[in-house]
C-alpha cells in the first residue's frame, strides 16, 4: 500500500541507473497487479451495474498500465 501521509515518499534523490529503474518498474508492475486484483474483487462483490461498469473500466486501465510498463522494460533491456 502507498505511503500517502508522506508527500515526499515518491521522490528520488538522484537519477537512477537503468538497472535501478528496471527494479523500480518491477515494483510498479507489482502495484498495478495488486490494483487489478482488488478492483476485480470489488467488481465481483457488487450487483450495482454502474459500479460494476466503473470498476471494470478502472481494472482494465490498470491492465493497460502493466502492458506499458512491460514495454518500457523491454525497451530498457
Task: Give short role names for the model-derived ranges.
Residues 1-77:
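Non-heme di-metal
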Amino acid at each position: 500500500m502507498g505511503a500517502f501521509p508522506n508527500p515526499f515518499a515518491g521522490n528520488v534523490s538522484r537519477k537512477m541507473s537503468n538497472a535501478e529503474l528496471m527494479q523500480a518498474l518491477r515494483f510498479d508492475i507489482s502495484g498495478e497487479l495488486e490494483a487489478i486484483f482488488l478492483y476485480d474483487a470489488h467488481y465481483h462483490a457488487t450487483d450495482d451495474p454502474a459500479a460494476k461498469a466503473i470498476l471494470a473500466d478502472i481494472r482494465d486501465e490498470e491492465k493497460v498500465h502493466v502492458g506499458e510498463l512491460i514495454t518500457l522494460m523491454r525497451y530498457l533491456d
